């Protein structure tokens, strides 16, 4: 997969204004992402999701995140995530490598 350190920089630049990753981290505009891998969409405790997110029914993993992060609104029509996505595959790979580590510590 990608480079964890590059992924951390991408997370700080593009994701951290709306998300946290640490265990017990607070929800912001978007949910805390701790425990993301292996969890179904729309399941972070204490966060209010759209019906689209709750009903998507996929399990978050490398493949689903690769597709979602390229174009969130295309992958889950009706999501309230306003982020336009990351077009460069290498950047998505780096971000996923970071998320895999950071959301599991």
UniProtKB/Swiss-Prot annotation:
InterPro entries xref list: Cyt_c-like_dom (IPR009056), Cyt_c-like_dom_sf (IPR036909), Cyt_c_1A/1B (IPR002327)
How is the protein modified post-translationally, according to the record?
Binds 1 heme c group covalently per subunit. Phosphorylation at Tyr-49 and Tyr-98 both reduce by half the turnover in the reaction with cytochrome c oxidase, down-regulating mitochondrial respiration.
State the Gene Ontology BP annotations. Answer: apoptotic process
Q: Which Pfam families match?
A: Cytochrom_C
Q: Which residues carry this modification: N6-succinyllysine?
A: 56, 73
Residues modified as Phosphotyrosine are 49, 98
Which residues in this protein are found as N6-acetyllysine? 73, 100
PROSITE patterns in UniProt: CYTC
Q: Which Gene3D superfamilies match?
A: Cytochrome c-like domain
Residues annotated as binding heme c are 15, 18-19, 81
Q: PTM N-acetylglycine: at which residues?
A: 2
Coiled coil, from the record: none
**GO CC terms on record?**
mitochondrial intermembrane space
Q: Which GO terms describe its molecular function?
A: electron transfer activity; heme binding; metal ion binding
* Keyword Acetylation appears in the UniProt entry: yes
Task: Please classify the protein's predominant subcellular localization into one broad category.
Answer: mitochondrion
Membership in a protein family = Belongs to the cytochrome c family.
Which PANTHER family does the entry mention? CYTOCHROME C
Q: What is this protein called?
A: Cytochrome c
Q: Which organism is it from?
A: Saimiri sciureus (Common squirrel monkey)
């Amino acid at each position: 997969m990608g480079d964890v350190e590059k992924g951390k920089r991408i997370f700080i630049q593009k994701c951290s204004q709306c998300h946290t990753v640490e265990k017990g981290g607070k929800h912001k505009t978007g949910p805390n992402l701790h425990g993301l891998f292996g969890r179904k969409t729309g399941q972070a405790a204490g966060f209010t999701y759209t019906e689209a997110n709750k009903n998507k029914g996929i399990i978050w993993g490398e493949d689903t995140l690769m597709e979602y992060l390229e174009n969130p609104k295309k992958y889950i029509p009706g999501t309230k995530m306003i982020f336009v996505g990351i077009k460069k595959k290498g950047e998505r790979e780096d971000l996923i490598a970071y998320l895999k580590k950071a959301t599991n510590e």
